[in-house]
Amino acid sequence: MFPGAWLCWVSLLLLARLTQPCPVGCDCFGREVFCSDEQLADIPPDIPPHITDIVFVETAFTTVRTRAFSGSPNLTKVVFLNTQVRHLEPDAFGGLPRLQDLEITGSPVSNLSAHIFSNLSSLEKLTLDFDRLAGLPEDLFCHMDILESLQLQGNQLRTLPGRLFQSLRDLRTLNLAQNLLTQLPKGAFQSLTGLQMLKLSNNMLARLPEGALGSLSSLQELFLDGNAITELSPHLFSQLFSLEMLWLQHNAICHLPVSLFSSLHNLTFLSLKDNALRTLPEGLFAHNQGLLHLSLSYNQLETIPEGAFTNLSRLVSLTLSHNAITDLPEHVFRNLEQLVKLSLDSNNLTALHPALFHNLSRLQLLNLSRNQLTTLPGGIFDTNYDLFNLALLGNPWQCDCHLSYLTSWLRLYNNQISNTHTFCAGPAYLKGQLVPNLKQEQLICPVNPGHLSFRALGLDEGEPAGSWDLTVEGRAAHSQCAYSNPEGTVLLACEESRCRWLNIQLSSRDGSDSAAMVYNSSQEWGLRSSCGLLRVTVSIEAPAAGP
């Protein structure tokens, strides 16, 4: 805002204060009054009649007397924030026929009588958060026929009367989080057919009765996180046809019935983070085709069934981090074509199948950090065209020939990929080196002795046409690299890594049976293939045999 406009606005506020009466200890702005004077001993009796909103902040009076606001019939909003109010007399808010929003937050109110709210028939929102309420009368809300939002978070409620919410048929939001509830009475929510959000987070619930949520057919968001739930009834959610978001994290759930989520066709968000799950039943998410976000992190999963996510074709985010997963089936992510974020960090993965991510063409963020990976198979990222964030840190990477695909891929997309900093764990001479900075010639694999065939034609222009059969120490491969010189007279086929370690032993030349023959020759070739350039030098010395 420009300085001139700001000064103009402040001037108007000051002018408004000067031209209208305002209670002592309060500030008035148009139709709003803010009272924050610690010396204020009671509700001001001289609140202007045109005021619609009044807010008390950190005031010291402890009692709201009967019909304390009766001189202000136009009030629609009354708020007490962090005040010392601890007692509300019967009909404390009587005489407020237009009151729609009442809030008492952070006050030491510990109990309420049944008649405190008896005349608030226009109330739409009631907030009693972070007070000291230990119990509620069963008929406390019986006259609030049009109440839409009820906030009871952060109190000390241990139980709920069975008929407490019976008259709240228009209720849309109910917040009971951060209390001490250990159980829910049967039918407690039976009349709340229009409820859209229910928060039961951070209580002490160990189980939920079979029909506890049975009538909530309009419910869209359900918070059950931060409790002590160990098991869930197979039909607990069977009537929640409208449910879109479900929070079950921070519990102690060790088993999920296969039919648990089968009625939740509109579910888009599911968090099972921080439970005690060891397995996922096959078909658990078979009926949740609309799911977009799924978190299974901080459990004890050791593997994932191949068909676990088969029907989740719209899934955007999947979190499997902080488990004990050692192995992932080749096709476990096969149908996740819309997946953007995949977290596999902090598991025990030692190897990944080359085709594991092949259908994830929209994948942008992949976290593989803090596993036991020593290498990655060739081609594993070839279809991940949108990948820009790849976390690899905390793996024991062996920087030898088997890591050549990863280093080449990182160099190729160096300007597009972030978060790739990770270090070699071996071999010893590369330990601590940054993997993305390695050169191809540094990635060497030792070769175990074996047999490899090598065929050279026309070693020297002066030699007659013919061939030499050479025995080469190195393992004979079903070759991926076929090297040749430009003339095609020298052919060498071997694995890329093993062509670096050749020890050649010559057998007798075909047709040569002269023991007295002396032969000296040396030849160098530059051989090329799709694997790169290989330089080969062969020196042959055949001294005459003794008599």
Swiss-Prot record:
Pfam families: LRR_1, LRR_8
LRR repeat locations: 98-119, 122-143, 146-167, 170-191, 194-215, 218-239, 242-263, 266-287, 290-311, 314-335, 338-359, 362-383
Location(s), subcellular: Secreted
Disulfide bridge positions per record: none
Main localization, broad class: secreted
Positions of the LRRCT domain: 395-447
Region forming the signal peptide: 1-21
Residue intervals of the LRRNT domain: 22-49
Keywords recorded for this protein, A-Z: Glycoprotein, Leucine-rich repeat, Repeat, Secreted, Signal
Function according to Swiss-Prot or TrEMBL: The 83 kDa subunit binds and stabilizes the catalytic subunit at 37 degrees Celsius and keeps it in circulation. Under some circumstances it may be an allosteric modifier of the catalytic subunit.
Protein name as annotated: Carboxypeptidase N subunit 2
